[in-house]
Curated annotation (Swiss-Prot):
Pfam families: PLAC8. It is found in: Cell membrane. This is Protein PLANT CADMIUM RESISTANCE 8. The modification Phosphothreonine is found at residue 23. It comes from Arabidopsis thaliana (Mouse-ear cress). Belongs to the cornifelin family. The chain crosses the membrane at residues 94-113. Residues 1-31 are annotated as: Disordered. One of its GO terms (cellular component) is plasma membrane. One of its GO terms (biological process) is response to oxidative stress. It is a single-pass membrane protein.
Length: 190
C-alpha cells in the first residue's frame, strides 16, 4: 500500500503526494478496457461479414462474352444489372443511358456503379471484398461490373434475359414442376 502524506507534504509539492526515498513506486495496473465506453468494446467486430462472392473480382475470363461486351460498352452491362436489381423498375435502356451519360459528362459513373454493388451485397449478404464498393468501381469498373453480372447469373438471375425474361423463365419452371391433378369434370356413374 502507499504511504499516507500529511497536508504539509502535499502543499510543498503543488498538491501532489511526495514519494519518500527508498519506498517502492507502487502503481496499480488497471486494464484499459475499463476506461473504454461499453459501445467501443462491442464495436470491435469483423466488418467483412457475409458470404464470399461466387467468383473473384478479376475472374473476367469466367464469362468471356460478358467480359468483351463490358470492355467495349460497360453501360450495357450496367443497364442489365440495374434492371435485375431493381426488379424491372429501371429498364435496361434507361440504366444504360444513365450510365452512358454519367461516364463522360461527370466522370462519376462509379457513383451509380458502387450504389448498385452495395445494393447487391446487401440483398445477397455478400462480403465487401477485396475492396470497398466505391474503390472497386473507381479502380476497376469493368471488372466490378463483370463480377456483379456473373454473381446474378450464378444465382439464376441472368441479366441478359432482362427482368421479364427471368420472370417468364421462373413461370415456365413452375409449370413444369406443378403436380398433375385429375380432370375436374369426372363423375362417378352407377
Amino acid at each position: 500500500m502507499g504511504r499516507v502524506t500529511t497536508p504539509s507534504e502535499e502543499d510543498s509539492n503543488n498538491g501532489l503526494p511526495v514519494q519518500q526515498p527508498g519506498t517502492p513506486n507502487q502503481r496499480t495496473r488497471v486494464p484499459v478496457s475499463q476506461f473504454a465506453p461499453p459501445n467501443y468494446q462491442q464495436a470491435n467486430v469483423n466488418l467483412s461479414v457475409g458470404r464470399p462472392w461466387s467468383t473473384g473480382l478479376f475472374d473476367c475470363q469466367a464469362d468471356q462474352a460478358n467480359a468483351v461486351l463490358t470492355t467495349i460498352v460497360p453501360c450495357v452491362t450496367f443497364g442489365q444489372i440495374a434492371e435485375v436489381m431493381d426488379e424491372g423498375e429501371m429498364t435496361c435502356p434507361l440504366g444504360t443511358f444513365m450510365y452512358l451519360l454519367m461516364m463522360p459528362a461527370l466522370c462519376s459513373h462509379w457513383v451509380m456503379g458502387s450504389k448498385y454493388r452495395e445494393k447487391m451485397r446487401r440483398k445477397f449478404n455478400l462480403v465487401e471484398a477485396p475492396y470497398s464498393d466505391c474503390a472497386s468501381h473507381v479502380l476497376c469498373p469493368c471488372c466490378s461490373l463483370c463480377q456483379e453480372y456473373r454473381e446474378l447469373k450464378i444465382r439464376n438471375l441472368d441479366p441478359s434475359l432482362g427482368w421479364n425474361g427471368i420472370l417468364a423463365q421462373g413461370q415456365g419452371q413452375y409449370e413444369r414442376e406443378a403436380p398433375s391433378f385429375a380432370p375436374t369434370n369426372q363423375y362417378m356413374s352407377k
